[in-house]
């Protein structure tokens, strides 16, 4: 269970760091477009502002997604021990650790690798409700649950 709590906390930190980085990037783009616009006129200026606005909208979308993931992660009780795979479970399958939480992908953590799965991920859906020792077949591959918390 300690692994799950540490992974959960580390994932929170990564999300917060990424939101902070994107916010700084957004501020810089906004500042740069304002500064480049001073004393400029014409089509070149308008195109520059439009491109900056598109980039800001893209960053805003990324920040919004990260905030949604942060909210979803807050709902998970990392202290809870599970006997079957469900939201908040951390499990080993085919010598790989997985955390049923948010779509984050592979997370390098304390000299090991944990793959963060969303609740829509095909592997999660195939294994949901199963216990240690049980298997599921996905894309022609057998997945056996070796450990679960």
Task: Tell me the role of every PLM-derived stretch.
Residues 1-76:
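N-terminal intrinsically disordered, low-complexity, charge/repeat-rich segments that act as generic
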Residues 20-23, 30-36, 40, 89, ...:
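Generic serine detector
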């Amino acid at each position: 269970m300690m692994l799950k709590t540490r992974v959960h906390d580390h994932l929170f930190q990564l999300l917060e760091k990424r939101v902070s980085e994107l916010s700084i990037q957004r501020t810089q783009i906004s500042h740069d477009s304002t500064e480049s616009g001073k004393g400029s006129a014409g089509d070149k200026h308008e195109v520059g502002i439009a491109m900056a606005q598109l980039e800001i909208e893209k960053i805003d979308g990324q920040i919004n997604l990260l905030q949604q993931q942060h909210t979803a992660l807050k709902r998970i009780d990392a202290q809870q021990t599970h006997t079957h795979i469900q939201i908040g479970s951390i499990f080993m399958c085919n010598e790989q650790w997985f955390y049923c939480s948010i779509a984050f992908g592979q997370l390098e953590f304390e000299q090991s690798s944990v793959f963060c799965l969303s609740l829509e991920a095909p592997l999660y859906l195939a294994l949901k409700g199963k216990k240690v020792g049980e298997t599921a077949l996905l894309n022609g591959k057998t997945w056996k649950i070796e450990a679960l918390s």
